[in-house]
Structures are given as structure tokens and as C-alpha cells.
């Protein structure tokens, strides 16, 4: 299999320093998280400062309270993302090793779990401060895509979450024995850069659409519309990219080489696709509901 692109010589660490005999490093993935949070915070502040964007020209909350909301959201992302990975992808392993559930630094986060964590955190926050739930959801979801874009780029830099073997001109030869373990391939194994596919779809394309709807089409005046577009857009993007992503190792067996979580004969769906289908359905319901209500 011949690929045009070799994986660039990139380090997962932006820089590292040694203090008092201990090594500290800033990783690209951590920087992506930080930058995504800062961008989301600024977008939320800008939106709440523009009263004309909202129903009855009234933002759901004051710009000064965004930082307080952000604390709840970060907790929802971390707790939900970790528990989602544990429950959706490796429940048997963590049932046998429960102390490792809290070891977030070892890796293992799931977007769908993080999303559920954010939903719960935002719902509790709205109850506590008497904030319109759908407008709060719109405020949050229109800010998420830049973080998704940066996170997927960091996945690429880390040479992780790569795609299935491919001989397309833009396929990439990722380093490491796991990436090179391609049954039936002689020589170097090239793979779909599925991280970049996700960055383009759920980050750049979806993010541009959401910002255009908010700032050019007045979508925030229809509570739930932006939330619906985000849910359906992310779900559809993830569903499509799952056809190119390397299947989750815990689902791969000799009789199930594609790592399908649900299978009927030769066909089925991955866990990512199964979790994305409810997102698409719920997103479409939100969109239809919002469009039925006069702005």
C-alpha cells in the first residue's frame, strides 16, 4: 500500500520543563482544551452582550455570569466524558478495576458522555438561576465547535484515533506498532486521517454554520433551533466519519473485524454510530419544534 503522505514529525508535547527533579509538559491536547474553553467563553460573552439576538431582546443571562456557568460546564464535560467512556466502551474492564475510573490522566473520554454531562450541568444551572432552558442550551451549543476543531487537530498531532487502512492519495502513514498493525498489508500501512475529517465536518463546517445562523439569520430568537442544528449536525458528521475511523479495539473479534457494536449478518453499526442516531433524531425534533414557533 503506497501513501503520498508520511506523518509529520510532530511531538505530542508543545514544550516540557524540569523543576525540582520532576518533569512538566504542556501537551497539544491540553492546549486545545484550554483554547476551546477560552473561545467558547468569549463567544458566549459576545452573544449575551447583543440583546437583539434573543427573544424579546432579552439574553438568558448577564455576560458577567458566563464564568460561573463555565465552571459547571467544565465539570460536566470531565465527569460525563469519563463516565461515558467507562460505561459505553469498557464497562467490563472498569468493573474489574474500579479504582482506575478516576485516573483521567491515563486517557479515556467519550464525547457523547461529555455531552450528557453538559446537558445535566446546564439543566441544574438553569433550575438554580431560573434561566430559560432552551435559550441557555442555544448559548452553549453555538460555542462548542471551535473546541471540537482544536481537539481533533490535537488528536492528529498525537497520532491517535486514526482511521481504517486506505490507499487514497491523502492517506497517512501513522507511527507506532498499533497503527502499523494492518492485516493483509505488505509494507507500510497508510490510514485515513479521520481526525482531520472530523475536524473539518464537526469543527469547521458545523461551527461556521452555527455562527452564521446566530449572527446573520437571527436563529437565537427561535429557542432550541441552534441546539437542534448542533445535535443533528454533530451526530450526522460523527455517523459518516465512523465509516472511516479505526474500529474500537474492544469490539473487534475474529468474527467482527469491523468492530461493530450492533450487528446483523455482515451489516451493523459502531458504538459511535449507535450513540449518534439519537442525537440526529433529537436534533431534528428541536429544529422542527423551533421552526413551528413564530420568532
UniProtKB/Swiss-Prot annotation:
InterPro entries: Lgt. Pathway: Protein modification; lipoprotein biosynthesis (diacylglyceryl transfer). Catalyzes the transfer of the diacylglyceryl group from phosphatidylglycerol to the sulfhydryl group of the N-terminal cysteine of a prolipoprotein, the first step in the formation of mature lipoproteins. This is Phosphatidylglycerol--prolipoprotein diacylglyceryl transferase. GO terms for cellular component: plasma membrane. It is an enzyme of class 2 (transferase). The chain crosses the membrane at residues 28-48, 69-89, 101-121, 131-151, 195-215, 224-244, 268-288. It is a multi-pass membrane protein. A 1,2-diacyl-sn-glycero-3-phospho-(1'-sn-glycerol) binds at residue 152. Belongs to the Lgt family. It comes from the Bacteria. The gene is lgt. Keywords: Cell inner membrane, Cell membrane, Membrane, Transferase, Transmembrane, Transmembrane helix. The lineage of its organism: Bacteria, Pseudomonadati, Pseudomonadota, Alphaproteobacteria, Rhodobacterales. Its EC number is 2.5.1.145. It is found in: Cell inner membrane. GO terms for molecular function: phosphatidylglycerol-prolipoprotein diacylglyceryl transferase activity. GO terms for biological process: lipoprotein biosynthetic process.
Amino acid at each position: 500500500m503506497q501513501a503520498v503522505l508520511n506523518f509529520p514529525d510532530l511531538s505530542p508535547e508543545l514544550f516540557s520543563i524540569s523543576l525540582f527533579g520532576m518533569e512538566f509538559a504542556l501537551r497539544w491536547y491540553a492546549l486545545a482544551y484550554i483554547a476551546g474553553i477560552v473561545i467558547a467563553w468569549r463567544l458566549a460573552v459576545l452573544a449575551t452582550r447583543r440583546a437583539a439576538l434573543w427573544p424579546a431582546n432579552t439574553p438568558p443571562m448577564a455576560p458577567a455570569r458566563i464564568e460561573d456557568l463555565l465552571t459547571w460546564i467544565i465539570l460536566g464535560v470531565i465527569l460525563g466524558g469519563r463516565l461515558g467512556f467507562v460505561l459505553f466502551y469498557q464497562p467490563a474492564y472498569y468493573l474489574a478495576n474500579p479504582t482506575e475510573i478516576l485516573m483521567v490522566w491515563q486517557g479515556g473520554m467519550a464525547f457523547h458522555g461529555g455531552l450528557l454531562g453538559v446537558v445535566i450541568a446546564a439543566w441544574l444551572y438553569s433550575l438554580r438561576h431560573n434561566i430559560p432552558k432552551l435559550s441557555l442550551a442555544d448559548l452553549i451549543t453555538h460555542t462548542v465547535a471551535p473546541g471540537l476543531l482544536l481537539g481533533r487537530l490535537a488528536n492528529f498531532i498525537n497520532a491517535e484515533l486514526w482511521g481504517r487502512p486506505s490507499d487514497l492519495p491523502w492517506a497517512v502513514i501513522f507511527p507506532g506498532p498499533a497503527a502499523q498493525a494492518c492485516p493483509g498489508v505488505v509494507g507500510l500501512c497508510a490510514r485515513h486521517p479521520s481526525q482531520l475529517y472530523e475536524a473539518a465536518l464537526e469543527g469547521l463546517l458545523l461551527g461556521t454554520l452555527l455562527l452564521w445562523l446566530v449572527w446573520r439569520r437571527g436563529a437565537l430568537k427561535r429557542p432550541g433551533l441552534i441546539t437542534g442544528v448542533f445535535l443533528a449536525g454533530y451526530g450526522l458528521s460523527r455517523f459518516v466519519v465512523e465509516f472511516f475511523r479505526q474500529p474500537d479495539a474492544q469490539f473487534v473479534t475474529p468474527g467482527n473485524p469491523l468492530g461493530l457494536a450492533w450487528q446483523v449478518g455482515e451489516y451493523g453499526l459502531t458504538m459511535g454510530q449507535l450513540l449518534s442516531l439519537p442525537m440526529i433524531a433529537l436534533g431534528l425534533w428541536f429544529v422542527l419544534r423551533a421552526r413551528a414557533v413564530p420568532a
